[in-house]
């Protein structure tokens, strides 16, 4: 529950700003660096708006790492080289209502000291959902293309954009056949087009340097065709190798934006060449020479005349009423456009006004994005099913009468948990409003028939799969099955997790294969995977299996007889034991029997065992409790013993290099710009150092990035050596 601003204490506001900074940074990373968003645009925007409200109410609490100071996200570890933008690629502030657009216009007038009776024009264009890209032309020739990254540093994608037909390798100074500005939406929706019959002769006469900025995107039809082609190619490859085909293992892009980002950011440009990418321009960056125009309209028209596409819906608006009308007109066409958009961008037209208005921390004062609401539709909730996940969590899933939302037919929605069902008051038979935004799972946002006489949905208190008691965690909203590995749903999901890429990474055992083998009674526990060699003839008799595919599967299984110990521990699916925690545990214990013995002692109340576990950096009471509970359950112990009778995990050791930090304790603080926190920790371990999360008298070295706060001060007070990220990179490079 969000607390009203007037009821917040200063300490509460500071804590909330800290949480928001971390949340927004996480979602920025997922969206910009990993192309894998977890929340809708609307949910993200709500976090940003709350942060802005808090900073306005408590300006003295604005943090160094505030989202209001950042653009995009630092470039993650990538094979693509980094590019520093000469002129930062900024973000845009957002508006969500007509009143906010009106306030933007009024704010521009106040800043420029322009009265209501004096005309001021704006441009308006649709905001395409793509990947920002900057194209640097020198003397009319393309010399470099770079992604936005964090606005200051992006990735070099020059070889990749050479395969995008919309991006010319050389600009041609063509005059326009017709203008872009002013008129209403025309029937064709065409952009300003060059007239080849009026080609200028002679050498390039434009600016010596001109950076065109815009969006790389993928048309909706091309996106669907690409996913279909990737599926067909994977099926053909499986047939050629006589492997069983598993659709679950085929890479499918979630939406056109992710497809565009994933296709452009390829180390091998020949992959990009096979992807149907497009581009259009909406602005510019660094310029050496004269800007070819005095208004936004004039420069955009000149860019189009040079042969670079611009938005077909780009217009000049003389009044606020025209701006709002153009937003409505674009919104009315949204479902029929051949590409996905998420709003309309307004910019002050006169460039001298833009220069006077300048920028705030991460956005220009002279532009704003009016966002569209998430796409919604009405339908009937026909049923509510309960699914049981790998960790026993009971998740309600709504089954819908099929409905088209945002160009996609939706039949299922997540209802999250018992509390969400109670909040919405939904029951089978209700009419509901369904919302879909981006690649996030569709969700019910409103119940249209809450007052109709119908029995409330009763959330089960027993597991629908095994009949074990289902209980709520103290202080939590989730309901979980207590059956553990005796629950068939948990067993199949845990088997899938066990063979996943993060765990044992066994090729040939996809989700459908595991479901099939489980139904046949061949797979009950992880150890059964290593007994599949005894069922070769039975597998071969199944439809779709050939000698080669069976042999490939069995060879992949046999290759994991001596698995990495931390991966094996991760594969068991113990609650709260992820990849990092599994590595941390095995670095301390080295062998699995030692871990089990300590966990069992800790559950029995042995204080020394509890101290041993919690002394491991990153291991808290939740992990200790989860380990104890796992080994306390008799069936889990049987599964563990059975598995270790089939595999022989070697003693876990971390290979280290000779380095000046070997044997020392290193702490990382502040914003790391060239690596993630996990990467930094892994580097420290490889150099023989211990990476700690807190500064103490035992700390030997602090690596401080931008925004370093209390840890830096404490280190300085204790006389601990402090270096920046570049200094750390030198240590890593020197160690080889």
Curated annotation (Swiss-Prot):
<dbReference type="GO" id="GO:0005829">
    <property type="term" value="C:cytosol"/>
</dbReference>
<dbReference type="Pfam" id="PF03120">
    <property type="entry name" value="DNA_ligase_OB"/>
</dbReference>
<feature type="binding site">
    <location>
        <position position="463"/>
    </location>
    <ligand>
        <name>Zn(2+)</name>
    </ligand>
</feature>
<feature type="binding site">
    <location>
        <position position="347"/>
    </location>
    <ligand>
        <name>NAD(+)</name>
    </ligand>
</feature>
<dbReference type="InterPro" id="IPR013840">
    <property type="entry name" value="DNAligase_N"/>
</dbReference>
<keyword id="KW-0479">Metal-binding</keyword>
<dbReference type="Pfam" id="PF12826">
    <property type="entry name" value="HHH_2"/>
</dbReference>
<dbReference type="GO" id="GO:0006281">
    <property type="term" value="P:DNA repair"/>
</dbReference>
<dbReference type="Pfam" id="PF03119">
    <property type="entry name" value="DNA_ligase_ZBD"/>
</dbReference>
<dbReference type="InterPro" id="IPR004149">
    <property type="entry name" value="Znf_DNAligase_C4"/>
</dbReference>
<dbReference type="InterPro" id="IPR001679">
    <property type="entry name" value="DNA_ligase"/>
</dbReference>
<keyword id="KW-0862">Zinc</keyword>
<keyword id="KW-0235">DNA replication</keyword>
<dbReference type="GO" id="GO:0046872">
    <property type="term" value="F:metal ion binding"/>
</dbReference>
<dbReference type="InterPro" id="IPR004150">
    <property type="entry name" value="NAD_DNA_ligase_OB"/>
</dbReference>
<feature type="region of interest" description="Disordered">
    <location>
        <begin position="170"/>
        <end position="205"/>
    </location>
</feature>
<keyword id="KW-0520">NAD</keyword>
<feature type="active site" description="N6-AMP-lysine intermediate">
    <location>
        <position position="127"/>
    </location>
</feature>
<feature type="binding site">
    <location>
        <begin position="91"/>
        <end position="92"/>
    </location>
    <ligand>
        <name>NAD(+)</name>
    </ligand>
</feature>
<dbReference type="InterPro" id="IPR010994">
    <property type="entry name" value="RuvA_2-like"/>
</dbReference>
<dbReference type="InterPro" id="IPR036420">
    <property type="entry name" value="BRCT_dom_sf"/>
</dbReference>
<dbReference type="InterPro" id="IPR012340">
    <property type="entry name" value="NA-bd_OB-fold"/>
</dbReference>
<comment type="function">
    <text>DNA ligase that catalyzes the formation of phosphodiester linkages between 5'-phosphoryl and 3'-hydroxyl groups in double-stranded DNA using NAD as a coenzyme and as the energy source for the reaction. It is essential for DNA replication and repair of damaged DNA.</text>
</comment>
<feature type="binding site">
    <location>
        <position position="125"/>
    </location>
    <ligand>
        <name>NAD(+)</name>
    </ligand>
</feature>
<feature type="binding site">
    <location>
        <position position="148"/>
    </location>
    <ligand>
        <name>NAD(+)</name>
    </ligand>
</feature>
<dbReference type="GO" id="GO:0003911">
    <property type="term" value="F:DNA ligase (NAD+) activity"/>
</dbReference>
<dbReference type="GO" id="GO:0006260">
    <property type="term" value="P:DNA replication"/>
</dbReference>
<dbReference type="InterPro" id="IPR033136">
    <property type="entry name" value="DNA_ligase_CS"/>
</dbReference>
<feature type="binding site">
    <location>
        <position position="481"/>
    </location>
    <ligand>
        <name>Zn(2+)</name>
    </ligand>
</feature>
<keyword id="KW-0464">Manganese</keyword>
<keyword id="KW-0436">Ligase</keyword>
<feature type="binding site">
    <location>
        <position position="466"/>
    </location>
    <ligand>
        <name>Zn(2+)</name>
    </ligand>
</feature>
<dbReference type="InterPro" id="IPR013839">
    <property type="entry name" value="DNAligase_adenylation"/>
</dbReference>
<dbReference type="Pfam" id="PF00533">
    <property type="entry name" value="BRCT"/>
</dbReference>
<keyword id="KW-0227">DNA damage</keyword>
<feature type="binding site">
    <location>
        <position position="371"/>
    </location>
    <ligand>
        <name>NAD(+)</name>
    </ligand>
</feature>
<keyword id="KW-0234">DNA repair</keyword>
<comment type="similarity">
    <text>Belongs to the NAD-dependent DNA ligase family. LigA subfamily.</text>
</comment>
<feature type="domain" description="BRCT">
    <location>
        <begin position="656"/>
        <end position="736"/>
    </location>
</feature>
<dbReference type="InterPro" id="IPR018239">
    <property type="entry name" value="DNA_ligase_AS"/>
</dbReference>
<dbReference type="Pfam" id="PF01653">
    <property type="entry name" value="DNA_ligase_aden"/>
</dbReference>
<feature type="binding site">
    <location>
        <position position="215"/>
    </location>
    <ligand>
        <name>NAD(+)</name>
    </ligand>
</feature>
